[in-house]
Amino acid sequence: MKKYAINILVILFLLTPFTLFANGCHANNDTIKVLAIGNSFSQDAVEQYLHELGEAEGITMIIGNMFIGGCSLERHVQNIRNNAPAYAYRKVEKDGEKTETRSMTIEKALADEKWDYISVQQASPLSGIYDKIGRAHV
């Protein structure tokens, strides 16, 4: 049963789109909560720029960023399987204050907030290579 649940989580991570502002998906003033599971590129793109874009539009956001430099989808899957405490977890609160926790598991980060959006990032050299995505399955 645990393996089945992990398989479902991995599939959901891989299929979750990362579109926050398209087509008016933010119809009210609630806080949007975004979790990125990625590598060093998610630091700038998610932690800094996304928070600033939301702020400029008057959208309150909480952003979580789980990252390992150069991490591939395959490694993310292994970390999910093993509940590995392999990530640095940076969190940007509503007011923009940042905190960092080392040796974090994906399981703990998922439980930290009721995330609205979750993105999983492939390592840059492997991005767009379909065969590399196929190998990441559970």
Model-derived segments and their meaning:
Residues N23-H76, K108:
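Serine-esterase "nucleophile elbow" of acetyl-processing enzymes
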Residues I8, G38, Q122:
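Residues that line or immediately flank small-molecule/substrate-binding pockets and catalytic motifs
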Residues I68-R90:
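N-terminal beta-loop-helix "entrance" segment that forms/cooperates
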Residues M1-L9:
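Bacterial N-terminal signal peptides that target proteins for export
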Residues S40-V46, L73, D95-K98, L126-Y130:
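Acidic-and-aromatic substrate-binding clefts and catalytic sites of carbohydrate-active enzymes
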Residues I8-T19:
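Bacterial N-terminal signal peptides
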Residues R102-H137:
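Alpha-helical cap/lid subdomain in secreted, periplasmic
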Residues N83-A109:
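Glycine-rich, highly charged phosphate/nucleotide-binding loops
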